[in-house]
Amino acid sequence: MSLKIVTAAFFSAALGLSAADFDASKLPPVSAKQGVTYEKDIKPLFERSCFKCHGPEKQKAKLRLDSLEATLKGGSNGAGFEKGASAKSTFVASVARLMSDDENMPPEGKGQAFSKEEVGLLRAWIDQGTK
């Protein structure tokens, strides 16, 4: 499978445009932490795991995660999640590694995978309104 096809397939899924199903009951629980913000809590995770392909220098599928505004805008196909609905997000499912191997993010060898606790923190940020 070509890299372009794999990349397109992932971003369609990650941006919520795929009919791909995932079992939301397998998502790590939402973090109990209150007041989760992009700058303080989420940006450091993205910087560590996502900026290599979705940062200031490179934006695969036009997805940029290095600012709150860009993250909320999403990539080529729009935002990857709906505020308040982390359990429905294929973006969350992809970093939780619940999608197919070519849809899970970050890809093997491209960044550090999110821990269950970090996925829970991402879920809390989305559920608390993405501030």
Language model region names:
Residues S18-K131:
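Aromatic- and Gly/Pro-enriched helix-to-coil junctions and flexible linker segments
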